[in-house]
UniProtKB/Swiss-Prot annotation:
The keyword Metal-binding applies. The keyword ATP-binding applies. Its EC number is 6.3.5.3. Gene3D superfamilies: PurM-like C-terminal domain, PurM-like, N-terminal domain. Part of the phosphoribosylformylglycinamidine synthase complex involved in the purines biosynthetic pathway. Catalyzes the ATP-dependent conversion of formylglycinamide ribonucleotide (FGAR) and glutamine to yield formylglycinamidine ribonucleotide (FGAM) and glutamate. The FGAM synthase complex is composed of three subunits. PurQ produces an ammonia molecule by converting glutamine to glutamate. PurL transfers the ammonia molecule to FGAR to form FGAM in an ATP-dependent manner. It catalyses: N(2)-formyl-N(1)-(5-phospho-beta-D-ribosyl)glycinamide + L-glutamine + ATP + H2O = 2-formamido-N(1)-(5-O-phospho-beta-D-ribosyl)acetamidine + L-glutamate + ADP + phosphate + H(+). Belongs to the FGAMS family. It comes from Parafrankia sp. (strain EAN1pec). It comes from the Bacteria. Keywords: ATP-binding, Cytoplasm, Ligase, Magnesium, Metal-binding, Nucleotide-binding, Purine biosynthesis. ATP binds at Y68, K109, N524, G561. This is Phosphoribosylformylglycinamidine synthase subunit PurL. Residues 1-30 are annotated as: Disordered. Residues 1-13 have a biased composition (Polar residues).
């Protein structure tokens, strides 16, 4: 495999022709998603017409999914977010890495598998979990937990009954088999997601600080080793078709590719094999095979190696790749997205030990190539050179577009349609009926039907899990631990994408701090419609600007993330849906704060200000089908202060429960905390206050906490000294025959609340979880 490669095999006519009508018929680049300009750029880069294999490689690597060609100009501002002392690896690698102390580092990232999960819900969701787990593994970490932010069409829509059970079963089936607890996430229903469900997955892992891996292929003469499953035709076109194209009005892509097929057992042994390789220091570089398969792994590792300044390049023989189907062509082998595969760079001295270790684990390991100093990626197939390209042209130097932006034409009318004109409940009976209707609505009801299909406590390190505000994991015997939460609100972002992104970050931070953890890093998954629509791109630009601004003001680094475009059916895009994940840190997880009210007599305190804010609210949507107005105001300084008070109160042992207020307002939070802890609550609203606003407003920057009576004055002084509004709204009552009693308005027994809250999803999707 050494020496000067011959030119890739093409016909003399193809070599002579330049781009234009003469080559269009022979090279179907448009069908592969490339534009005329992009094709001409490829020809100019190579100085010739590309081979079929090269054309396939450029088509997937320059797809929206791989190249970020429409989003890159806006994502750059995330690099300006604070680089804290804890940040070890930021944007640019497979996942961000932060130092959490005690010689440990944590890596986490959220990605999407939206389009495959609509086509094949079970496999799409399962392989979405598998892919994000391998991203975490690639950094050198042991995966330890999963979160799954999900969005579906209307809860009673026929296709939701097809998609949701399959997605949930896929996540549970794959994650449970890997032995990974699913500790958090979201389930949201809205008709805009009917043809485009959002299946986002976050994984978190832990490792020794000194074991961080990189993807760079360096060291001339080092071996290129393919680990894991054999390569088949599953997933071919998954990137170039599914993640970079809209669905047609019939509910599917115009070109239907093969969705990847997952095997969690193979992934499990691959994880253990790779972790032992890392522990023994047997690899110099590592990359998972996900979107675009070998094409992406080979080009990214080679380009990363060259970027280090060391001599770099790679030669690969595809005949050595273990195949499931012997009839596959070169471009199919390169584009296959078969799951459970990794690419390792190994020194010649370590190669025998690597192969022996893989054999012991039952993992297929094959030396398929060599690191060179040619500066090029050369691929042979049946003895002929089919690829000879500069790897950076694929991995780093693809097209970058500054697409036109246009404020949505209907936005002013949408914002002017404020919910203030909607009929509001004014009597105690009407408030009672509204509360019962709200807590039974698809977006506010219990998620137990979903979460009970996941193993939330496997590995015995889960401290808190759904339905808590954040998932909490123990990292060491000392009590060191982390909290994770994901949040997003498409309705808020539809009304104001800048504020909507900031509200998503603010809520994720509140969830983490309500559990008692200090936020230290952010990841994001940006789900939007077609980038070819100027109105969608305006929404995207606004959301990026809002999120970057909020991260800077809160002092949080963005460690990485994902962009998912083309989430629309025909000309109808989804709501702009930035999903934000926040990582928090505990010194001692035994000091975590749950949401449940458990101690009779505890004072219930409301932190923050309540305003008449119902734009984009769950009340307006669930009771009136209304979307309009402006979302709640976001005050990032207040959010930061609230978080500091919640974390401080937790560490000082002043809180027995804490719950952030978001969708559904105070009423929803009280119901969830009462049911979680099995105790009632007696609430007294301020004299002369509007009971409806007090109970259902979605004002941001608020939380309800339970404080032992003996600590109430101390906690109130803590809030007063820092300038955080704090007022007592009630007390926790007994658990036997308890109720949620709002003085002067209504009382609802816990049993009635539980029946309303827990019955919706089983009724819609079946009793068997």
């Amino acid at each position: 495999m050494t020496g000067t490669p011959s030119a890739p095999t093409t016909s003399p006519d193809d070599q002579a022709d330049g781009p234009g009508e003469g080559t269009v018929d022979r090279q179907p680049y448009r069908e592969l998603g490339l534009t005329d300009d992009e094709y001409e750029r490829i020809v100019a880069t190579l100085g010739r017409v590309p081979t079929d294999a090269e054309l396939a490689m450029y088509s997937v690597m320059w797809s929206e999914h791989c190249s970020y060609k429409s989003s890159k100009v806006h994502l750059r501002q995330f690099r300006d977010t604070p680089a804290t002392d804890r940040l070890l690896v930021g944007m640019g690698e497979n996942a961000g890495v932060v130092d959490v102390g005690e010689g440990l580092a944590v890596t986490f990232k959220v990605e999407s598998h939206n389009h495959p999960s609509f086509v094949e819900p079970y496999q799409g969701a399962a392989t979405g979990v598998g892919g994000i787990v391998r991203d975490i593994l690639t950094m050198g970490a042991r995966p330890i937990g999963i979160l799954d932010p999900l969005r579906f069409g209307a809860a009673d829509a026929p296709d939701t009954a097809r998609v949701l059970p399959g997605v949930v079963a896929g996540i549970g089936g794959y994650g449970n088999c890997l032995g990974l607890p699913t500790i958090g996430g979201e389930v949201v229903f809205d008709p805009v997601y009917g043809g485009n469900p959002l299946v986002n997955a976050l994984c978190v892992g832990v490792m020794p600080v000194g074991r961080v891996q990189t993807s760079a292929a360096t060291g001339v003469g080092n071996a290129v080793v393919l680990l894991g499953a054999k390569t088949g035709r599953d997933g071919i076109g998954g990137v170039s078709v599914l993640a970079s194209a809209t669905f047609d009005e019939g509910g599917g892509p115009a070109r239907r590719p093969s969705v990847q097929v997952g095997d969690p057992f193979t992934e499990k042994i691959l994880i253990e094999c790779c972790l032992e390789l890392f522990d023994r220091g047997l690899v110099t570089g590592i990359q998972d095979l996900g979107g675009a398969g070998l094409t992406c792994a080979l080009t990214e590792t080679t380009a990363a190696g060259i970027a280090t300044g060391q001599p770099g390049g790679m030669e690969v023989d595809l005949d050595l790749v273990p195949l499931r189907e012997a009839s596959m062509a070169a471009h199919e082998v390169l584009a296959s997205e078969s799951q459970e595969r990794m690419l390792a760079i190994v020194t010649p001295d370590a190669l025998p030990e690597v192969l022996a270790l893989a054999e012991r684990w039952g993992v297929i390991a094959t030396n398929i190539g060599t690191v060179t100093d040619s500066g090029r990626l050369v691929v042979r197939w049946h003895g002929e050179v089919v690829v000879d390209v500069p790897p950076g042209s694929l991995a780093d130097d693809g097209p970058v577009y500054e697409r036109p932006l246009r404020r949505p034409a209907d936005l002013d009318l949408l914002r002017a349609d404020a919910p203030s004109a909607l009929e509001r409940p004014r009597t105690g009976d009407a408030l009672r009926a509204t509360l019962l209707r709200m807590i039974a609505s698809p977006n506010l009801c219990s998620r137990a039907w979903v979460t009970e299909q996941y193993d939330r406590y496997v590995q015995a390190n889960t401290v808190l899990a759904q339905p808590e505000d954040a998932g909490v994991l123990r990292l060491s015997a000392s009590g060191l631990g982390i909290a994770l939460a994901t949040d997003g609100n498409g309705r808020y972002a539809r009304l104001d994408p800048f504020a909507g992104a900031q509200l998503a970050l603010a809520e994720a931070c509140r969830n983490v701090t309500a559990a008692g953890a200090e936020p230290i890093a952010v990841t994001n998954c940006l789900n939007f419609g077609s980038p070819e629509d100027p109105e969608v791109m305006w929404q995207f630009a606004q959301a990026c600007a809002g999120l970057a601004d909020a991260c800077r003001r809160l002092g949080l680094p963005v460690t990485g993330g994902n962009v998912s475009f083309y989430n629309q059916t025909g000309s109808a895009p989804i709501h702009p849906t930035p999903v934000v994940g926040v990582l928090g840190l505990f010194d001692d997880v035994t000091r975590r704060t749950p949401i449940g009210f458990t101690d009779e007599g505890d004072a219930l305190l409301l932190l923050g200000d309540t305003r008449d804010e119902f734009g984009g609210s769950e009340w307006a949507w669930a009771t009136h089908g209304h979307l309009g107005g402006t979302p709640p105001a976001v005050d990032l300084e207040r959010e930061k202060l609230l978080g500091e008070i919640l974390v401080g109160g937790s560490r000082e042992g002043l809180l027995t429960a804490a719950h952030d207020l978001s969708e559904g307002g105070l009423a929803q939070a009280l119901v969830e905390s009462c049911l979680r802890g099995g105790h009632g609550a007696r609430i007294e609203l301020p004299a002369g206050a509007d009971a409806f606003v007090e109970l259902f407003s979605e004002s941001a920057g608020r939380a309800v906490v339970a404080v032992p009576a003996a600590e109430q004055d101390r906690f109130a002084r803590l809030c007063a000294d820092r300038g955080l509004p704090c007022r007592q709204i009630g007390v926790v009552t007994d658990g036997e025959g308890g109720s949620l009693n709002v003085a002067g308005e209504f009382a609802i027994p816990l049993d009635e609340l539980r029946a309303a809250h827990e019955g919706t999803l089983p009724r819609l999707f079946g009793r068997g979880a």
